[in-house]
């Protein structure tokens, strides 16, 4: 009886191993892309508009020695899987209202490519931008910033700009800002100017 039971289990094991199950092959590149996207999302998960500098220091986004600078660098430099050389924050009354990703890129096509990589990420999340501009290398003037795309989403504005520098170098910027804080800041400035008059 034990021999028959053993043979039946062995036969089932052999049949199970030889069945035509479809194996799921996940390409390694998609795993890498997913990992970098998840990593980038996690990096900014706790960063919120209106945070003060102490909160950002405690969460590790900025360092204490950088808070004395006019432009405060941020430690995370990616939007999705697109990495920038520099990222900085802007504050008003010690409250976060903007994050600026910027890079000095060689070559017009490389500059535009970087901006459109970011645009595609935001397209997937927010749909088509509210404003789109097509520029050519010849149409860009030195030290004049051109907006390539712009979203106004509830209380957030996302803007991608390019600026021609000397020779074949370009400044590329992606600005994400809280429009409520920006609006309050602008209103305060307007009120102050009108008071002077």
Language model regions located:
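Positively charged n-region of N-terminal signal peptides that target proteins for export
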Residues: 1-4
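Compositionally biased P/S/T/G-rich terminal and signal peptide-adjacent segments
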Residues: 22-33, 73-95
């Amino acid at each position: 009886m034990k021999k028959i039971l053993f043979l039946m289990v062995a036969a089932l094991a052999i049949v199970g191993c030889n069945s035509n199950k479809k194996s799921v092959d996940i390409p390694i590149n998609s795993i890498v892309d997913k990992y970098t996207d998840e990593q980038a999302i996690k990096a900014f998960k706790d960063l919120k508009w209106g945070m003060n500098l102490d909160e950002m220091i405690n969460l590790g986004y900025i360092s204490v020695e950088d808070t004395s600078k006019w432009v405060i660098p941020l430690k995370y430099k990616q939007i999705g899987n697109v990495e920038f050389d520099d990222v900085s924050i802007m504050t008003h009354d010690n409250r976060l209202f903007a994050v600026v990703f910027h890079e000095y890129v060689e070559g017009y096509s490389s500059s535009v490519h970087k901006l459109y990589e970011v645009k595609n990420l935001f397209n997937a999340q927010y749909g088509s931008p509210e404003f789109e501009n097509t520029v050519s290398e010849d149409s860009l003037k030195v030290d004049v910033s051109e907006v390539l795309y712009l979203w106004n989403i509830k209380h957030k504005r996302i803007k991608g700009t390019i600026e021609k520098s000397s020779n074949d170098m370009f400044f590329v910027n992606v600005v994400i800002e809280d429009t409520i804080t920006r609006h309050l800041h602008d209103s305060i400035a307007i009120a102050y100017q009108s008071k002077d008059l």
